[in-house]
């Protein structure tokens, strides 16, 4: 009887190991799933444009244009909080290195991918309206770094700042962004504070996250 119990225990242990491995593999596969992100815009050497994004259905879209379309509108979808918004792609321009201060200057730092908190502060200070449009007139918004890391909406915040830069300039104001230490870390490839969603997308595209 004791021998039979040993045999049954051994069989149970042997059978349970593959099941455990499969469960671990399933967990790893689940963690590798893409989540809403982007768009990422690449100016190609031949003058074309590549736009990569992940939509709400977690579907990856990868669009290549032979040349940069005029007035191209990009849709940005926050990860969880907030509503989608559109951004018009502009030609890259070098910004002035100095400027006169405005009557009002709002200085922020360290949004760290937290879109909900970021827009809540901007709304409370009358910098944007409910639709994320610039409402700060001729005043200035200055974000002194650390948009990267920790949160799920790094790209959404960057695109919102890009949008506000255009709208502020049209209104006679300014929206400015300065690099922080977390931007410098990411550009060097130090991704220990980045959320897995960004690393998963980079792995899917077979590129390094810093690129």
Task: Label each region the model flagged.
Residues 1-25:
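Bacterial Sec-dependent N-terminal signal peptides
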């Amino acid at each position: 009887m004791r021998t039979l119990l040993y045999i049954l225990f051994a069989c149970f242990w042997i059978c349970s190991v593959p099941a455990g491995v499969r469960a671990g593999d399933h967990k790893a596969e689940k963690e590798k799933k893409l989540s809403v992100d982007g768009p990422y815009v690449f100016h190609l050497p031949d003058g074309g444009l590549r736009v990569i994004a992940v939509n709400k259905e977690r579907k990856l879209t990868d669009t290549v244009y032979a040349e940069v379309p005029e007035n191209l509108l990009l849709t940005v979808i926050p990860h969880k909080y907030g509503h989608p918004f559109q951004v018009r792609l502009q030609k890259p321009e070098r910004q002035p290195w100095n400027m006169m201060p405005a009557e009002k200057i709002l200085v922020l730092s360290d949004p760290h991918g937290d879109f909900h908190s970021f827009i809540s502060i901007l709304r409370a200070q009358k910098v944007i309206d409910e639709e994320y449009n610039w409402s700060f007139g001729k005043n200035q918004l200055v974000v002194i770094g650390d948009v990267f890391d920790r949160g799920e909406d790094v790209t959404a915040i960057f695109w919102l700042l890009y949008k506000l830069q255009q709208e502020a300039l049209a209104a006679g104001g300014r929206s400015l962004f300065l690099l922080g230490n977390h931007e410098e870390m990411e550009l060097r490839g130090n991704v220990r504070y980045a959320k897995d969603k960004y690393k998963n997308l980079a792995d899917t595209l077979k590129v390094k996250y810093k690129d």
